[in-house]
């Protein structure tokens, strides 16, 4: 499901939601809310803040050290620079919903 499909899912009046608040969102409001949440998560992660939303999951930054790798095409050795890797770890409610 892409972003547009997810916004439609959030505002679908025929969908069986547990919470009535989902049914009151317009597509424009849903898009604004989603953009606000995503931009806030990106901004917090960019500032090296971890985000933990109980039950949903956590967003963290993991630092990856510089290392030596190989070009898969030629087999030549190459240096891979250090970088920060954003990660998401699902919470208990998210895991339970998937199983």
Curated annotation (Swiss-Prot):
Which region ranges are annotated with the description Disordered?
67-86
Q: Which UniProt keywords apply?
A: DNA condensation, DNA-binding
Please provide, alphabetically and separated by semicolons, the GO molecular function terms listed in this UniProt record.
DNA binding; structural constituent of chromatin
| UniProt key word DNA-binding | yes
Gene3D superfamilies assigned to the protein according to its UniProt record, in alphabetical order = IHF-like DNA-binding proteins
A single Gene Ontology biological process assigned to it is: chromosome condensation
* SMART domains noted in UniProt: BHL
Family membership, please give it: Belongs to the bacterial histone-like protein family.
Q: How does it assemble?
A: Homodimer.
Q: What does this protein do?
A: Histone-like DNA-binding protein which is capable of wrapping DNA to stabilize it, and thus to prevent its denaturation under extreme environmental conditions.
Full protein name: DNA-binding protein HU
Source organism of the structure? Rickettsia felis (strain ATCC VR-1525 / URRWXCal2) (Rickettsia azadi)
Q: What is the lineage of its organism?
A: Bacteria, Pseudomonadati, Pseudomonadota, Alphaproteobacteria, Rickettsiales
This chain is encoded by the gene named hup
